[in-house]
């Protein structure tokens, strides 16, 4: 039977029959399907965690939602717009105005200060607002580090910068890819609490992927990515 998404007057994110494949290594001409998702939906302001081990397509899935990579087929409807109908420039604009992304491994620019890294989260959206960037650093407890460079910060502090940058463009959806993977237990707990709190405060929905059961246990709405992604149980041609 086809998987149906329950009716909701307005979803922030709606996915239908989303697929992505890559060429198999070795040049044999075959394709390896990484993502094959029949249906998924996320309400405004929702906080959902996806459980999945490394190599299961979680990062590719988030990159599809962010428009960083193009889908092979299917539909991604984000904030009322069809993402898959847009070219690369259109996807970039939609991402800049709608999505915040907390990358695995922080992904901070080492040649820029902490404040500049946060401002870069605004650069392709509504324009740089230094006052907002400073306020975000205040919110994540790094106001006194605004002139520092990422290499001068601890791992926990770098993750806080990444959180501030993700919120810089006032997103409606925050994507978080293994956001605690490089942190010790204490910093992981603090980072997770911070991410969830700032999303609640701003009204942004949160979609987080992780394999850490301690992280996943914090979410009332936790789903198994292996059950969602049919590519893990089928062989693509």
Each language-model region and where it sits:
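ABC-family P-loop ATPase nucleotide-binding domain
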Residues: 1-21, 232-237
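ABC family nucleotide-binding domain
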Residues: 12-13, 19-218, 225
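H-loop (His-switch) and adjacent beta-strand-loop-beta switch element
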Residues: 219-236
